[in-house]
Each structure stands twice: as structure tokens, then as C-alpha cells.
């Protein structure tokens, strides 16, 4: 009775856990809907493992319940059962079967390990292979397109159907680079260079995250990977590489002056101007989110500029609580004007 009372308390929690599995959140942040060869391999092997575990569980529990029902002690049955001290056939069987199951799991695992470790460019792409240097900062991502000669922040663009090589670094603490829909995760470690490759099967926007606890705003260290058709990707690269023109609108041009006078250019590069202490702003006006998770609208942008610590604790962005409304409006107009795609 006591056991049943204890179980009845935890049973609702078990069902609650089952229901919570439906709270997946954003559909582009899941490994269960693969959009690339790496992610597909991970998904297929996960399904294979589940099938193997399910078959083993079914067989083991079936034998368990059959024996429990057939050979359980009955009332008045005091006879001592026949004592068995070994069965060679059974022992061989329950040794060979696990070996076979392990081989079934080991072969694709080893094959995939070598596939993931292959960092050579795709022969079909050759010299057009995209190389991206990824640097993890608290709490944002920097993407350097070394062959093209420019830097992007928070949003990383790749061409569809091509193997893209990533070189991973960390500026401060341990991070982990992960785009669930396209592949597995890999750590970025201070002082150590890691490599990986990803490929997208179709155009789309795929959410990425830091998958290693790195500080108070770790959960907000998100980014987006945008996969484009090759011609669109080339147009984006051309726009990012071009010299940034002065804004044509008066308000945005005033905002550019506010941007420079408040030393924003000292941290946020625009085109080839500025440094990479913070995310590059060359295409800021095209981003869907700011600070990794906030919708890119005027209200959120002003709140971020005035008090970034209230929105993302532990970041190094200075606050500008006393900036006038006129300067703030002009600065936001300037940031909105920073686009490279029509």
C-alpha cells in the first residue's frame, strides 16, 4: 500500500514530463528535422539506436513476464525447483547477440566519425569553397569570411548544397557552436583551433546556439545561419565586400555622426571601418533579431542602447541612458539604413 501511495504521487509527474516533450519551441531549432547530410546521419543513427533498444527491451520484458506468470510460486507449492548451474547454449546466445547489436551500431558510427573528420574541400566546388572563421565571445558570435575579406556578426550566411569549412576559436571562455538542423556541436576553446564542416540541403534560416554554459547570458547566445542559393549568396558577398555608402536620408546621416561621436565605431565595424570588439554592423538593418534574441524593432533597439545589462547580463556593451531622443531617433535610423541586399 505504501509503495502504491508513493507511486501515485510521482505518476502525474511522469505524464507531465511526457507532455512537456511537445514544448519544442522554434521549429528551426531541432535535430529531429534534419536539413543537411550531417544532421541526417545523426538522425538516422538515433532512429537505429532507438529501434535496437526497443527490440532488446521488448524481448527482455517479454521473457521476464512469461517467466513471472508461468513459474511463479503457487500457494501450497513447497517443492524445490530443479537447480541449474549453467547452460552453455544460453550463455553463448546472450553473448553473441549483444556483440551483433554492437557491431550494427558501431559500423555507421565509425563511418560517420570519419565523414565528419573530413575537412577537405568539395572537389566539385574547388577554389570556391567557403571558409569561415568562427569566434565565440561572451555572448555573441563573430564570423570572419577570410577569403572574401570581411566580417559578419550574429548572422552567418552559406551557399546551399556546398560543404562549408568552419574554423572555430574562443575569445574568452569555453563555448560550443551548434546548428541542430544541420549537424552536431563542437566546442570553441581559448587557445585551441577546432574545425568542422556543415552543408545545407535547402535554402532557409536555421537557428544556432551556444551549447556550453559560458556565463550569465549563455541561454541568450543565439545566432542564425542563413542558407542561400549560390547566386544570392554571391550577391550578399558582393554587398558585404563593397564600400559602405553614406546614407541618403538626412536623419540617417545625422545618425551616422551620432554613431561616430559616441565611439560606437570603436567596437562595431561597418564595412571595412571599425574593429571587431563587438558584432559587425555592415548589414544590421537586415537582421531579424538584435542581441541574439530580441526582435529587431525600434523599441527593443532603444532599450538595448540605453541599458544593455537589463536585457543581457554580463555583456560588455556600454550603456547610453542619457542619450537625447533626437540623437536616439537618428542613430536608429542610421542602423536601419545599413543593408547590403535589395
UniProtKB/Swiss-Prot annotation:
Role of this protein: Subunits I and II form the functional core of the enzyme complex. Electrons originating in cytochrome c are transferred via heme a and Cu(A) to the binuclear center formed by heme a3 and Cu(B).
Membership in a protein family: Belongs to the cytochrome c oxidase subunit 2 family.
Membrane topology: Multi-pass membrane protein
Family annotation (Pfam families): COX2 (PF00116), COX2_TM (PF02790), Cytochrom_C (PF00034)
Gene3D superfamilies for this protein: 1.10.287.90, Cupredoxins - blue copper proteins
Residues the record lists as binding heme c: 264, 267-268, 317
Domain named Cytochrome c: residues: 250-342
Signal peptide, first to last residue: 1-22
Swiss-Prot/TrEMBL keywords: Cell membrane, Copper, Electron transport, Heme, Iron, Lipoprotein, Membrane, Metal-binding, Palmitate, Respiratory chain, Signal, Translocase, Transmembrane, Transmembrane helix, Transport
Name this polypeptide is given: Cytochrome c oxidase subunit 2
Organism superkingdom: Bacteria
Entry GO terms, CC: plasma membrane
Lipidation (N-palmitoyl cysteine): 23
Cofactor requirement: Cu cation; heme c
Residues in the Extracellular compartment per record: 23-50, 109-342
Listed InterPro entries: CcO_II, CcO_II-like_C, Copper_CuA, Cupredoxin, CuRO_CcO_Caa3_II, Cyt_c-like_dom, Cyt_c-like_dom_sf, Cyt_c_oxidase_su2
Membrane spanning residue stretches: 51-69, 90-108
Lipidation (S-diacylglycerol cysteine): 23
Residues exposed to the Cytoplasmic side: 70-89
Species this protein is from: Alkalihalophilus pseudofirmus (strain ATCC BAA-2126 / JCM 17055 / OF4)
Parts forming coiled coils: none
Cofactor comment: Binds a copper A center.
Lipoprotein is among the record's keywords: yes
Catalytic reaction annotation: 4 Fe(II)-[cytochrome c] + O2 + 8 H(+)(in) = 4 Fe(III)-[cytochrome c] + 2 H2O + 4 H(+)(out)
Enzyme class: translocase
Amino acid at each position: 500500500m505504501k509503495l502504491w501511495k508513493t507511486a501515485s504521487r510521482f505518476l502525474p509527474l511522469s505524464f507531465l514530463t511526457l507532455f512537456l516533450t511537445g514544448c519544442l519551441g522554434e521549429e528551426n531549432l531541432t535535430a529531429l528535422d534534419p536539413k543537411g547530410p550531417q544532421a541526417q546521419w545523426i538522425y538516422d543513427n538515433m532512429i537505429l539506436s532507438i529501434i535496437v533498444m526497443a527490440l532488446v527491451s521488448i524481448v527482455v520484458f517479454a521473457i521476464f513476464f512469461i517467466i513471472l506468470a508461468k513459474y511463479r510460486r503457487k500457494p501450497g507449492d513447497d517443492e524445490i525447483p530443479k537447480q541449474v548451474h549453467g547452460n552453455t547454449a544460453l550463455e553463448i546466445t546472450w553473448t553473441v547477440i549483444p556483440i551483433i547489436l554492437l557491431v550494427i551500431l558501431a559500423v555507421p558510427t565509425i563511418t560517420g566519425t570519419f565523414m565528419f573528420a573530413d575537412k577537405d574541400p568539395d572537389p566539385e566546388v574547388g577554389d570556391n569553397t567557403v571558409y569561415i572563421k568562427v569566434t565565440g565571445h561572451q555572448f555573441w558570435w563573430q564570423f570572419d569570411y577570410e577569403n572574401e575579406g570581411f566580417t559578419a556578426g550574429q548572422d552567418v550566411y552559406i551557399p546551399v548544397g556546398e560543404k562549408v569549412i568552419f574554423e572555430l576559436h574562443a575569445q574568452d571562455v569555453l563555448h560550443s557552436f551548434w546548428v541542430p538542423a544541420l549537424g552536431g556541436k563542437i566546442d570553441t576553446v581559448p587557445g585551441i583551433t577546432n574545425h568542422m564542416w556543415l552543408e545545407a540541403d535547402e535554402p532557409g534560416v536555421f537557428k544556432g546556439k551556444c551549447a556550453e554554459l559560458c556565463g550569465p547570458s549563455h541561454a541568450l547566445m543565439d545566432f542564425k545561419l542563413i542558407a542561400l542559393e549560390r547566386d544570392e549568396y554571391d550577391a550578399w558577398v558582393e554587398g558585404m565586400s563593397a564600400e559602405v555608402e553614406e546614407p541618403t536620408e538626412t536623419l540617417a546621416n545625422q545618425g551616422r555622426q551620432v554613431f561616430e561621436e559616441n565611439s560606437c565605431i570603436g567596437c562595431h565595424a561597418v564595412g571595412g571601418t571599425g574593429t571587431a570588439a563587438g558584432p559587425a554592423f555592415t548589414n544590421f538593418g537586415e537582421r531579424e533579431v538584435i542581441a541574439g534574441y530580441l526582435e529587431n524593432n525600434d523599441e527593443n533597439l532603444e532599450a538595448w542602447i540605453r541599458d544593455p545589462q537589463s536585457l543581457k547580463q554580463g555583456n560588455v556593451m556600454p550603456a547610453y541612458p542619457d542619450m537625447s531622443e533626437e540623437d536616439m531617433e537618428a542613430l536608429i535610423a542610421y542602423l536601419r539604413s545599413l543593408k547590403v541586399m535589395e
